[in-house]
Amino acid sequence: MSSGGLLLLLGLLTLWEVLTPVSSKDRPEFCELPADSGSCKGNFQAFYYNPVQHQCLEFIYGGCDGNANNFKTIDECKRTCAA
């Protein structure tokens, strides 16, 4: 195979890697945790990944404690956890 062909193949593989969504095997374990409002009494919009529905959903975060399945934006949740 010529060097041009190898470069094209490398470019296509790189593009495929970037565009392929997060698969369940690549998803961080904390994405499987349930929504956890925490122990504080705040009222903050947050998002968590729901592994049963395979989507990011809104919940109310109290402002402290909770767990790592807690995102400020739905886009951040999708980038991290959504397949």
Swiss-Prot record:
Tissue specificity of this protein: Expressed by the venom gland.
Protein name: Kunitz-type serine protease inhibitor superbin-3
Coarse class of the protein's main subcellular location: secreted
Keywords: Disulfide bond, Protease inhibitor, Secreted, Serine protease inhibitor, Signal
Single GO molecular function: serine-type endopeptidase inhibitor activity
Residues marked Reactive bond for trypsin (site): K41, G42
Cysteines joined through disulfide linkages: C31-C81, C40-C64, C56-C77
UniProt cross-references to PROSITE patterns, sorted A to Z: BPTI_KUNITZ_1, BPTI_KUNITZ_2
One Pfam short name: Kunitz_BPTI
InterPro entries: Kunitz_BPTI, Kunitz_BPTI_sf, Prtase_inh_Kunz-CS, TFPI/VKTCI-like
Highest taxon in the source lineage: Eukaryota
Domain BPTI/Kunitz inhibitor residue range list: 31-81
Location of this chain's protein in the cell: Secreted
Cellular component terms per the entry's GO annotation: extracellular region
Similarity comment: family membership: Belongs to the venom Kunitz-type family.
Species: Austrelaps superbus
Role description: Serine protease inhibitor.
Leader peptide range in chain numbering: 1-24
